[in-house]
Curated annotation (Swiss-Prot):
Keyword Hydrolase part of the UniProt annotation: yes
Gene Ontology biological process terms, A to Z: G protein-coupled receptor signaling pathway; nucleoside diphosphate catabolic process; platelet activation; purine ribonucleoside diphosphate catabolic process
Result of changing C399S: Abolishes ecto-ATPase activity, accumulates intracellularly
Function: In the nervous system, could hydrolyze ATP and other nucleotides to regulate purinergic neurotransmission. Hydrolyzes ADP only to a marginal extent. The order of activity with different substrates is ATP > GTP > CTP = ITP > UTP >> ADP = UDP.
Listed Pfam families: GDA1_CD39
Name of the molecule in the record: Ectonucleoside triphosphate diphosphohydrolase 2
Length: 495
């Protein structure tokens, strides 16, 4: 009898396994998307005062044809901007090597060949291109030669227009503040039901204002049409060359030399030797350049801590005398009325942060911002050093910077108290620097082919539960049959 039981057991188990296998093969499957691989992109932001490298990453499959991009890492290039190497183009290229070596480590090796690498130069190179196009070309050729030596997919080095710089800064700000697309708690991307913010960027050589508008564009050059994340946007943008912080300081310095013989925006007790060649070498100060001046001559200049004269000096930077349109900002440039909330970054942030944090002054309203600027301009050099130790390098220029920001926002762009209440001053958002570079990469990802998503065969949860129950039933049935056979074998045989 035991032999009979042993002979029945394998067929029973085999039948159960076969039945389970047949059921498994009959269950319909569907394609389930695997987590997408990451792609990387590198942007070198070649500004007027310095160069920064940003490495971005995004899923290889994209959301509505624009990559979901986040900052992976960054690196500040030592030295000045590449435009400062006009007499030594190879120095511009060599300055980038340290950050490029870091990029080799930050981007996975297997992704090097597919990682696009871009260099975008802004107002510093725009100015150099105006005064010395040959030198500008030589600098771009030198950095191009170095960038092509690395295993990345180099896509070019070029000078961005002021319009591009403004628009890409606007894209960055709104992306980081989740106005285009947001990751919800349900684990899906969705478009939030809120408007966009305007963006104001104050660089070293230019300043940009960009915002979405429904007003008709009287100057077509100031209107840009964008398509991001399946949505269409019409924005106003304008870039003012020579109105960046560094160039404004140079222009004020040139005016002070010509008009006063002292600098009303510098603190009393501060003096320095000014090299005339440094003051007048920029095209921004060319109109103020005296005839037959000695570029190697040095002039001693002292500060006077005079906020009223400083305000007059800053006001001279703006012209409101003529406007060929229904309304203008300044210098005859068309601008619709500012609308909605704004984010102000770069030197806007650093200036206001100095007033708010270092000086402890309120800046929540335009009136408070003006009072804070006057407060700083009233300080002597000794008082400023005692109040803000450790910032000697730029300390003497904060009065002029604060006056300029206040005048630019109130008189230049036309912010009143109500509109100014909607302006936030911000350096970073979501651990990512606010600037044009991320917006540039977001725009360029429309041109980068998406990898097809990886697929694997998967089973619905409900089907999986049914299979589990069937397997368990088959095994239980086999066990019951086995026990019955064993029990039958133990009973006494009848004759």
């Amino acid at each position: 009898m035991a032999g009979k039981v042993r002979s029945l057991l394998p067929p029973l188990l085999l039948a159960a396994a076969g039945l389970a296998g047949l059921l498994l093969l009959c269950v319909p499957t569907r394609d389930v998307r695997e987590p997408p691989a990451l792609k990387y992109g590198i942007v070198l932001d070649a500004g007027s005062s310095h160069t920064s490298m940003f490495i971005y990453k995004w899923p290889a499959d994209k959301e509505n044809d624009t990559g979901i991009v986040g900052q992976h890492s960054s690196c500040d290039v030592p030295g000045g901007g590449i435009s400062s190497y006009a007499d030594n183009p190879s120095g511009a290229s060599q300055s980038l090597v340290g950050c490029l070596e870091q990029a080799l480590q930050d981007v996975p090796k297997e992704r090097h060949a597919g990682t696009p690498l871009y260099l975008g130069a802004t107002a510093g190179m725009r100015l150099l291109n105006l005064t010395n196009p040959e030198a500008s070309t030589s600098v771009l050729m030198a950095v191009t030669h170095t960038l092509t030596q690395y295993p990345f997919d180099f896509r070019g080095a070029r000078i961005l227009s002021g319009q591009e710089e403004g628009v890409f800064g606007w894209v960055t700000a709104n992306y980081l503040l989740e106005n285009f697309i947001k990751y919800g708690w349900v684990g899906r991307w969705f478009r939030p039901r809120k408007g966009t913010l305007g963006a104001m960027d104050l660089g070293g050589a230019s300043t940009q204002i960009t915002f979405e508008t429904t007003s008709p564009a009287e100057d077509r050059a100031s209107e840009v049409q964008l398509h991001l994340y399946g949505q269409h946007y019409r924005v106003y943008t304008h870039s003012f060359l020579c109105y960046g912080r560094d160039q404004v300081l140079q222009r004020l310095l040139a005016s002070a030399l010509q008009t006063h013989g002292f600098h009303p925006c510098w603190p009393r007790g501060f003096s320095t030797q000014v090299l005339l060649g440094d003051v007048y070498q920029s095209p921004c100060t060319m109109a103020q350049r005296p005839q037959n001046f000695n570029s190697s001559a040095r002039v001693s200049l002292s500060g006077s801590s005079d906020p009223h004269l400083c305000r007059d000096l800053v006001s001279g930077l703006f012209s409101f005398s003529s406007c060929p349109f229904s309304r203008c900002s300044f210098n005859g440039v068309f601008q619709p009325p500012v609308a909605g909330n704004f984010v102000a970054f770069s030197a806007f942030f650093y200036t206001v942060d100095f007033l708010r944090t270092s000086m402890g002054l309120p800046v929540a309203t335009l009136q408070q911002l003006e009072a804070a600027a006057v407060n700083v301009c009233n300080q002597t050099w000794a008082q400023l050093q005692a109040r803000v130790p450790g910032q000697r390098a730029r300390l003497a220029d904060y009065c002029a910077g604060a006056m300029f920001v206040q005048q630019l926002l109130s008189r230049g762009y036309g912010f009143d108290e109500r509109a100014f209440g909607g302006v936030i001053f911000q350096k970073k958002a979501a651990d990512t620097a606010v600037g044009w570079a991320l917006g540039y990469m977001l725009n360029l990802t429309n041109l980068i082919p998406a990898d097809p998503p990886g697929l694997r065969k998967g089973t619905d949860f409900s089907s999986w539960v049914v299979l589990l129950l069937l397997f368990a039933s088959a095994l239980l049935a086999a066990l019951v049959l086995l026990l019955r056979q064993v029990h039958s074998a133990k009973l006494p045989s009848t004759i």
